[in-house]
């Protein structure tokens, strides 16, 4: 244990926890804003500290001299805190710890499935890429919902792709209502994903888009641009996600039945359509006001 040397009224109890047995024996340090440090060792998947209250601290998990996790927290008067510091691929905070340590390739394989909660209900997500464009995004894992949401949705209320995905009703929904439905720990670790997407209206011009939750561009799925602007690949740098190199993985279902599902790429040859994936897993496009399946994506990347 890492109890403080002195007694303070209203001490704050902090418990570093992990669900991974491999974290036992690793060192946990806590450093105050004034530079005082406490140290302990993970045992039985936890390490406890009693700290002076009303201060800001930094907690770190260290293995072999390498800091695998670090975060700041505030310790209130008489407060009890549990802080997850371990490498657990099945929890949002554990995944964040893994990518912060640069160990995503050791813990994840493309095709792994992880369960997250949406409005308190379990939903299965596929690992569609590990370390996607690492030179751009750093250490990361990309997740996409295995099945589409139960409710199909329009990309826009009318048949237009003007402004691209960034101006769509779908974007507003996914970054708003849907994001807010995710468990709070997951919301806290999702990375704002920045990429170059088409502006629509039959243009090959691109715009920078930033989203917490997003849909893939056509190239992410097919490794080609059949109906999207080729600049999403040649200028924007999009790459195919490894999960979708297997064509069978491109077929998705909503409510147990295979469905057409939306992509974020505007259809480059007209102004009314967005790219999509048909029930056979092939590239296609549909009018923006049609209701189709939605398979949300997000990235968890290192700080």
Roles of regions detected by a PLM:
Residues 32-46:
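Short, acidic Ser/Thr/Gly-rich low-complexity loop/linker segments typical of extracellular
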Residues 20, 34-36, 63-65:
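Solvent-exposed strand-loop boundary residues in beta-sheet-rich modules
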Residues 1, 8, 64-87, 214:
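Structured interaction patches on ligand/partner-binding surfaces of diverse proteins
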Residues 46-58, 63, 77:
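Short Pro-Gly-centered beta-turn/loop motif in secreted/extracellular proteins
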Residues 9-27:
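Structural motif
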Residues 1-12, 59:
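Viral virion structural and adsorption modules
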Residues 84-303:
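Collagenous Gly-X-Y triple-helix signature in extracellular proteins
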């Amino acid at each position: 244990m890492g109890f403080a040397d002195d007694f303070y009224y209203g001490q704050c109890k902090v418990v570093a926890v992990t669900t991974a047995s491999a974290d036992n024996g690793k060192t946990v340090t806590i450093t105050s804003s004034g530079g005082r440090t406490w140290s302990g060792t993970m045992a039985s998947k936890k390490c406890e500290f009693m700290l002076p209250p009303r201060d800001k601290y930094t907690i770190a998990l260290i293995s072999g001299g390498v800091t695998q996790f670090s975060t700041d927290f505030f310790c209130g008067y008489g407060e009890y805190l549990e802080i997850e510091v371990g490498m657990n691929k099945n929890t949002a905070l554990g995944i964040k710890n893994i990518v912060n340590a640069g160990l995503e390739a050791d813990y994840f394989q493309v095709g792994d499935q992880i369960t997250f909660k949406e409005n308190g209900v379990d939903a299965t997500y596929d690992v569609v890429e590990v370390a996607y464009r690492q030179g751009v995004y750093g250490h990361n894992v990309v997740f996409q919902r295995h099945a589409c949401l139960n409710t199909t949705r329009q990309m826009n209320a009318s048949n237009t792709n003007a402004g691209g995905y960034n101006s769509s009703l779908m974007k507003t929904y996914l970054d708003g209502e849907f994001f807010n439905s995710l468990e709070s720990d997951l919301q806290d670790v999702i990375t704002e994903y920045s990429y170059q997407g088409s502006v629509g209206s039959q243009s090959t011009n691109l715009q920078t888009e930033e989203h917490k939750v997003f849909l893939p561009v056509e190239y992410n799925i097919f490794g080609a641009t059949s109906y999207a602007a080729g600049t999403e690949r040649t200028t924007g740098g999009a790459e195919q996600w490894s999960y979708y190199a297997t064509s069978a993985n491109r077929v998705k279902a909503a409510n147990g039945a295979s469905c057409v599902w939306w992509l974020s790429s505007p259809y480059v040859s007209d102004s009314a359509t967005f790219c999509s994936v048909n029930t056979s897993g092939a590239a296609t496009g549909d009018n923006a006001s049609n209701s189709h399946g939605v398979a949300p994506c997000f990235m968890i990347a290192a700080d």
